[in-house]
């Protein structure tokens, strides 16, 4: 009975530690490339590079719209 209790507590502690580490990993600082300023509306958006860089998130006919 005691062994079962100890095992349950150990599993719960490990689960909490795992969630804490995962949460910190999601909030990690982005690399320098990801910190670039976004492109304002009416400016050229480089959708061909595969990354959308418009502040609004919309690129229509290679122009940022929003």
Swiss-Prot record:
Q: What is this protein called?
A: Conotoxin Cal6.38
Q: Where in the cell is it found?
A: Secreted
- What keywords were assigned to this record? Disulfide bond, Knottin, Neurotoxin, Secreted, Signal, Toxin
Q: Which residues form the signal peptide?
A: 1-22
Q: What does this protein do?
A: Probable neurotoxin.
The domain of life for this entry's organism is Eukaryota
| Positions of disulphide bridges | 38-55, 45-59, 54-64
Which family does the entry's similarity section mention?
A: Belongs to the conotoxin O1 superfamily.
One molecular function GO term is: toxin activity
Keyword Signal attributed: yes
GO cellular component assignments: extracellular region
Tissue specificity as recorded in UniProt: Expressed by the venom duct.
Please tell me the species this chain comes from. Answer: Californiconus californicus
Write out the domain note.
The cysteine framework is VI/VII (C-C-CC-C-C). The presence of a 'disulfide through disulfide knot' structurally defines this protein as a knottin.
């Amino acid at each position: 009975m005691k062994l079962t209790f100890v095992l349950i507590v150990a599993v719960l502690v490990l689960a909490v530690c795992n969630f804490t580490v995962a949460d910190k990993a999601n909030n990690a600082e982005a690399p320098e490339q990801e910190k670039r300023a976004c492109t304002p509306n009416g400016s050229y958006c480089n959708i061909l590079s595969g990354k959308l860089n418009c502040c609004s998130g919309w690129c229509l006919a290679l122009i940022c719209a929003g």
